[in-house]
């Protein structure tokens, strides 16, 4: 059974996705189909959760839009993802940042920044 799952996951096309950790601020370009037209929509926010592995991995991204918190669960290997850009690397001591849901204003997106060394 495990071999069958690995075979299916190996054939799944995926977007080259950088390493995403809770606390990172990301911008995800998603393809949106409206009627017969297709356009790109940017969703920028803080990764508050990741779960799963392989082809079934998902991340939860949270942003504040006009004073209202918006969360979106995004499958990492979705064919609707055009690109993923990490804007800031956050330093989080937890794997799930659900406590950000209770915060308001700028504090709702405040996560300490983590220094990342560039490797060539």
UniProtKB/Swiss-Prot annotation:
<comment type="function">
    <text>This protein is located at the 30S-50S ribosomal subunit interface and may play a role in the structure and function of the aminoacyl-tRNA binding site.</text>
</comment>
<dbReference type="GO" id="GO:0022625">
    <property type="term" value="C:cytosolic large ribosomal subunit"/>
</dbReference>
<dbReference type="InterPro" id="IPR008991">
    <property type="entry name" value="Translation_prot_SH3-like_sf"/>
</dbReference>
<comment type="similarity">
    <text>Belongs to the bacterial ribosomal protein bL19 family.</text>
</comment>
<keyword id="KW-0687">Ribonucleoprotein</keyword>
<dbReference type="InterPro" id="IPR018257">
    <property type="entry name" value="Ribosomal_bL19_CS"/>
</dbReference>
<protein>
    <recommendedName>
        <fullName>Large ribosomal subunit protein bL19</fullName>
    </recommendedName>
</protein>
<keyword id="KW-0689">Ribosomal protein</keyword>
<dbReference type="GO" id="GO:0006412">
    <property type="term" value="P:translation"/>
</dbReference>
<dbReference type="InterPro" id="IPR001857">
    <property type="entry name" value="Ribosomal_bL19"/>
</dbReference>
<dbReference type="GO" id="GO:0003735">
    <property type="term" value="F:structural constituent of ribosome"/>
</dbReference>
<dbReference type="InterPro" id="IPR038657">
    <property type="entry name" value="Ribosomal_bL19_sf"/>
</dbReference>
<dbReference type="Pfam" id="PF01245">
    <property type="entry name" value="Ribosomal_L19"/>
</dbReference>
